[in-house]
Amino acid sequence: MIKVAILGKPNVGKSSLFNRILRERDAIVSEKAGTTRDIKKREVSLDDDLEEIVLLDTGGLEERDELFNKVKEKALEVAKEADLVLYMVDGKTIPDEEEIKYFRNLQKLGKHIILVVNKIDNDKMMEKVYDFYELGADEIFPISVSHNRGVGKLIERIKKFVPKKPKTFEVSEFEQEIPLEDLLVAEENEENLEELKEIKVAIVGRVNVGKSSLLNALVGEERAIVSDVDGTTIDPIDENIYHDGWNITFVDTAGIRRRSKIKDIEKYALLRTEKVLEEADIAILVIDAKEGIVELDEKIGGLIDKHKNGVIIVANKWDENAEEFHKFRKEVYYRFKYLYFAPFLAVSAKTGRNIDKLKDEIIRVYKNYSKRIPTATLNKWIEEATIRHHLPTDIGGKEVKIFYATQYKTKPPTIALIMNRNKLHFSYRRYLVNFLRKKEDFEGTPIIFVARKKGEKHEEA
């Protein structure tokens, strides 16, 4: 699989081109220089007949401070790994010494480089392109990402570097044909198997609690750029690892600031965090063990509760003794009452303490999150629960009955109670949830009950 890297100074349109190729708004795009600070990696198919490519969007190459020096180093490292480099420039400006210097350094790597001159919005601006010939590029493509001008030609050029998919045999080439229904069953079973082995994990928390450091520790290499600057990571960075037979995808989300401090790009990041939680199976809520729990931590926990993710609470930067751990653990469950079912783990991304244990915990919580209870077993437990603690009567004093129960969804486990009423008092629902937790390992996952009167659609109890 070939790698195509997009490089250039901040605000020349790298993320916009990245998104155009992906055909979706994935990277956060802003007029603020240096919006994309981390290396983003996506696999994309440019044509059905071609193999997929790995598209890499790098941070802007501008030498201003320590953070951007790190970004620059990362971008150049990516260029070394890439098979094709798209070096983007702003067609509305002229190349300066710094830009020429970067381009010369890239040429020394011996990579095939396409110079992409962006913001050439019309034919009159084509003369601007000639200013960039002094860079000595082998190929120059004038484009306008915002006007979708010339992008198609650029993609066609990229395709020339992509190998074709290996030829596949037609069914007729086999001596024995396989019945269509068998193929469909096999495909369905394969999809189910893949689903059972895929976990999507969102790493969430407020700014500078160590989410990027935790991601790097989990993945085993420095993918997210780490800095003491608040909000260093803006875009989510997807990284996959294989652990104990499972494919785990980590998404390192932008830190959430207090609302009074949210401006411009942080608003995008907040929305992206919500989006990631919607798509994720498991949320890792990262809190700073040294700073302790603040109100914003609780609000972020509320987002997890809202989206009904499986959850693990992680205290990062932990270096205290066992006695302090138990005190802090008690405070965690006091402040996060609505996440009382979440396991709590103290880790150190810096030293690697409990990182492997966290990986194991992700798998365990996901198994609970996707668990299905056999109907016979579930009804046995519900019957036992109602015998131990009778159902409350309704407002009119009439008896409330549960005829039977069935789990109709997983992720999270969702159970329908078929009743003579379509509502169940919240206190009894809580009792049933706690009863089930004693019978089965549901740590890390919410359990949802819906009350359904015979003949009616599901409604949340």
From Swiss-Prot:
BP terms from Gene Ontology: ribosome biogenesis
Residue ranges constituting the EngA-type G domain according to the UniProt record: 2-166, 199-370
GO molecular function, one term: GTP binding
Keyword GTP-binding: yes
Residues of the KH-like domain: 371-455
The entry's keywords: GTP-binding, Nucleotide-binding, Repeat, Ribosome biogenesis
PROSITE patterns assigned: G_ENGA
Residues reported in the UniProt entry to bind GTP 1: 8-15, 57-61, 118-121
SUPFAM superfamilies: P-loop containing nucleoside triphosphate hydrolases (SSF52540)
Binding positions (GTP 2): 205-212, 252-256, 316-319
Pfam families tied to this protein: KH_dom-like, MMR_HSR1
Entries under InterPro entries matching the protein: G_ENGA, GTP-bd, GTPase_Der, KH_dom-like, KH_dom-like_a/b, P-loop_NTPase, Small_GTP-bd
HAMAP family xrefs: GTPase_Der
Subunit structure: Associates with the 50S ribosomal subunit.
UniProt similarity note: Belongs to the TRAFAC class TrmE-Era-EngA-EngB-Septin-like GTPase superfamily. EngA (Der) GTPase family.
Entry function: GTPase that plays an essential role in the late steps of ribosome biogenesis.
Name of this chain's protein: GTPase Der
Provenance organism: Nautilia profundicola (strain ATCC BAA-1463 / DSM 18972 / AmH)
Gene behind the chain: der
